[in-house]
């Protein structure tokens, strides 16, 4: 009999009394153990079952009592479980078997969680994997790990097997280091135990002490020589011996954990491979085009024929959102020197302004991006790349008088070329174009329409490094002075006929905040051939457009008829006809507001009537000799 009950016994007694069992019935059941022990097959009443619980409580402090052992021998599957390591005690000498049983009995009497932490610390100190414990004891790997790491309860029989292995391993390791210090064979003590380990040797595992030494050496030298590796071997083995609490002279007792020169070589090789892999992974991560706002990259200035430049990355432009996927178009541009054609292929991204209907778009996939000898093109999605024209395009700095034409289906940059090449260069079938002409004697910022919502809303200034010559003093481009002599041209966007019309379903045109932003000359014409735009005299014409009556508009004709614009020139040799590539649609593409077109001969007051604040008109400058033959 024990003089004092444990906490578990006290809780069990309290549970028995709370279940309705009286103290007298409990004492009576304890006084009659015979019927209780033989009642395993028959039905038991409360007194007998509770008495059985009390009978087991008396033997709990012994730890290895027969009653408790019979309880723990039953595994989860209901079968008797006897660890194989306990059966091996019979093979030992009686003195050794008695010693191990005594030590295991002592460990079983202690706190299981404290003993579990002690066993785990020993495994870490000697770099012993849990697999070796599982192979020797027959315990479940998961159950053993949870017991050592979290203190999960384990039955006494299984804990006895774990503690038996722990005691035996301590003895085995001590013998290894002892024989290593004496110069004897270290395999003799473990030779008889090889069958219990299922013939498997422990895999080498780097200890924390050795890893610290190796990482410090790797920082100094990533590929040490053989002499340096041998020095590291001695340092690692010394650290491993100190970690185990033995003398460095007994390093041979480390067994499978002995550090060798080959293992050090492999460790450094693996570290170099890992570093190279991480470097390659980082390079692959940052090698792609960096996403973010800003103008997309321009086409390379030194593109060779037949080699398409890299695709333009889509850029986020203020007021513009990207819609349909990009398609690629190819345009052939005659060079100014009469050389071979230069073919450039670049994607035109379908974009739509924020104020436009989903069915509309600013840049159609039908357009072509034309590049000439003047230099690289600005991105298709925006004209703001012209800000960096001086820094990024030396070729354009030398020839600042390039004509930049922008129509809604596309954007074109045309450099100085031969007169014969102007015709195919300026041909942009299927679109009308808003062309802004300039005449000034000073270097100035040219406004370029950058973003379009329900109307032309944003004027983006573009700084030119050299002054533009006035129309009555110098020609725009000497090679083509007989065809374009009145003024230099800077082009921006507009569209009067297209399935993706800009002003469809918009009641009125919004105003500009500034009325003097644009220079002196603006005209609306078809751009199939601009060679006839010469020697135009100033006057004023007013075109009115109605969304319902297309016959009243000078800009709309029925779909079954074609429109021809005749622009006479002072030079009879340069008189040509501008034929639109497509028939103008009768569908409402412009609001019912009137379209007033001016041209002023005086350059000083020309900006005062351009784009007034009235929402119902757009005032631009146009020639008097432009006529519309609406049929």
Curated annotation (Swiss-Prot):
SUPFAM superfamilies given in the database record: Dimerization cofactor of HNF-1 alpha, Homeodomain-like, lambda repressor-like DNA-binding domains
Protein's recorded name: Hepatocyte nuclear factor 1-alpha
Superkingdom to which the source organism belongs: Eukaryota
PROSITE patterns documented for this protein: HNF_P1, HOMEOBOX_1, HOMEOBOX_2, POU_4
Compositional bias (Pro residues): 288-298
Record note on what altering residue 31 to D does: In MODY3; benign; no effect on interaction with PCBD1 and DNA
GO molecular function terms attached to this record: DNA binding; DNA-binding transcription activator activity, RNA polymerase II-specific; DNA-binding transcription factor activity; DNA-binding transcription factor activity, RNA polymerase II-specific; protein dimerization activity; protein heterodimerization activity; protein homodimerization activity; RNA polymerase II cis-regulatory region sequence-specific DNA binding
Summary of subunit composition and partner proteins: Binds DNA as a dimer. Heterotetramer with PCBD1; formed by a dimer of dimers. Interacts with PCBD1. Interacts with BHLHE41. Interacts with NR5A2. Interacts with SPOP; this interaction promotes ubiquitination and degradation of HNF1A.
Keyword Nucleus found: yes
Pfam families given in the database record: HNF-1_N, HNF-1A_C, HNF-1B_C
Outcome when changing residue 48 to K: In T1D20; likely benign
Record-linked InterPro entries: HD, HNF-1, HNF-1_N, HNF-1_POU, HNF1_dimer_N_dom_sf, HNF1a_C, HNF1b_C, HNF_P1
Region called Dimerization, residue ranges: 1-31
Residues where Phosphothreonine is found: 74
Effect seen on changing residue 161 to T: In MODY3; uncertain significance
Disease: Hepatic adenomas familial: Rare benign liver tumors of presumable epithelial origin that develop in an otherwise normal liver. Hepatic adenomas may be single or multiple. They consist of sheets of well-differentiated hepatocytes that contain fat and glycogen and can produce bile. Bile ducts or portal areas are absent. Kupffer cells, if present, are reduced in number and are non-functional. Conditions associated with adenomas are insulin-dependent diabetes mellitus and glycogen storage diseases (types 1 and 3). Maturity-onset diabetes of the young 3: A form of diabetes that is characterized by an autosomal dominant mode of inheritance, onset in childhood or early adulthood (usually before 25 years of age), a primary defect in insulin secretion and frequent insulin-independence at the beginning of the disease.
GO cellular component, one term: chromatin
DNA-binding positions: 199-279
Effect ascribed to mutating residue 246 to D: Reduces transcription activation by 75%
């Amino acid at each position: 009999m024990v003089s004092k009950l444990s906490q578990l016994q006290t809780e069990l007694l309290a549970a028995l009394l709370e279940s309705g069992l009286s103290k007298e019935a409990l004492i009576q059941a304890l006084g009659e153990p015979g019927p209780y022990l033989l009642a395993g097959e028959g039905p038991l009443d409360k007194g007998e079952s509770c008495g059985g619980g009390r009978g087991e409580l008396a033997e709990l402090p012994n730890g290895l009592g027969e009653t408790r052992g019979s309880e723990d021998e039953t595994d989860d599957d209901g079968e008797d479980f006897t660890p194989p390591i306990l059966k091996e005690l019979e093979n030992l000498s009686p003195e050794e078997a008695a010693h191990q049983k005594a030590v295991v009995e002592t460990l079983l009497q202690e706190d299981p969680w404290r003993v579990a932490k002690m066993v785990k610390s020993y495994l870490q100190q000697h770099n012993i994997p849990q697999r070796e414990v599982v192979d020797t004891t027959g315990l479940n790997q998961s159950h053993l790990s949870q017991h050592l790491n979290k203190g999960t309860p384990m039955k006494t029989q299984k804990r006895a097997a774990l503690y038996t292995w722990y005691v035996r391993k301590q003895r085995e390791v001590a013998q290894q280091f002892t024989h290593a210090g004496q110069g004897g064979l270290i395999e003799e003590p473990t030779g008889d135990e090889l069958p219990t380990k299922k013939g498997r040797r422990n895999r080498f595992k780097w200890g924390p002490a050795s890893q610290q030494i190796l990482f410090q050496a790797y920082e100094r030298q990533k590929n040490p020589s053989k002499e340096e590796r041998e020095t590291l071997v001695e340092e690692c083995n010394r650290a491993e011996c100190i970690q185990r609490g033995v003398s460095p002279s007994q390093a041979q007792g480390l067994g499978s954990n002995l550090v060798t020169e080959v293992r050090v070589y492999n460790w450094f090789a693996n570290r170099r491979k890992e570093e190279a892999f991480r470097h390659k992974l980082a390079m692959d991560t940052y090698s792609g085009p960096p996403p973010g706002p800003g103008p997309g990259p321009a086409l390379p200035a030194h593109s060779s024929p037949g080699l398409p430049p890299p695709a333009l990355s889509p850029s986020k432009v203020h007021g513009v959102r990207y819609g349909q996927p990009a398609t690629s178009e190819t345009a052939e541009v005659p060079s100014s020197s009469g050389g071979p054609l230069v073919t450039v292929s670049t994607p035109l991204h379908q974009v739509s302004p924020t104020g436009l209907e989903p069915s509309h778009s600013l840049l159609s996939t039908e357009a072509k991006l034309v590049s000439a000898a003047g230099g690289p093109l600005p991105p298709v999605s925006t004209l703001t790349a012209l800000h960096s024209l001086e820094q990024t395009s030396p070729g354009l700095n030398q020839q600042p008088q390039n004509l930049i034409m922008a129509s809604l289906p596309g954007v074109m940059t045309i450099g100085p070329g031969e007169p014969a090449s102007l015709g195919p260069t300026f041909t942009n079938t299927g679109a009308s174009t808003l062309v802004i002409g300039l005449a000034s004697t000073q270097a100035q910022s040219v406004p370029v329409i950058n973003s379009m919502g329900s109307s032309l809303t944003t004027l983006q200034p573009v700084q030119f490094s050299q002054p533009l010559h006035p129309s009555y003093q110098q020609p725009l481009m000497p090679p083509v002075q007989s065809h374009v002599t009145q003024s230099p041209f800077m082009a921006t966007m507009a569209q009067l006929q297209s399935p993706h019309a800009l002003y469809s379903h918009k009641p009125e045109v919004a105003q500009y905040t500034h009325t003097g932003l644009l220079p002196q000359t603006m005209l609306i014409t078809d751009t199939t051939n601009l060679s006839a735009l010469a020697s135009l005299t100033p006057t004023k014409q007013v075109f009115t457009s109605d969304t319902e009556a297309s016959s009243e508009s000078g800009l709309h004709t029925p779909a079954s008829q074609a429109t021809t614009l005749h622009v006479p020139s002072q030079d009879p040799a340069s008189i040509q006809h501008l034929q639109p590539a497509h028939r103008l649609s009768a569908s409402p593409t412009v609001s019912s507001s009137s379209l007033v077109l001016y041209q002023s001969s005086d350059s000083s007051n020309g900006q005062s009537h351009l784009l007034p604040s009235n929402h119902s008109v757009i005032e631009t400058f146009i020639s008097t000799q432009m006529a519309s033959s609406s049929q």
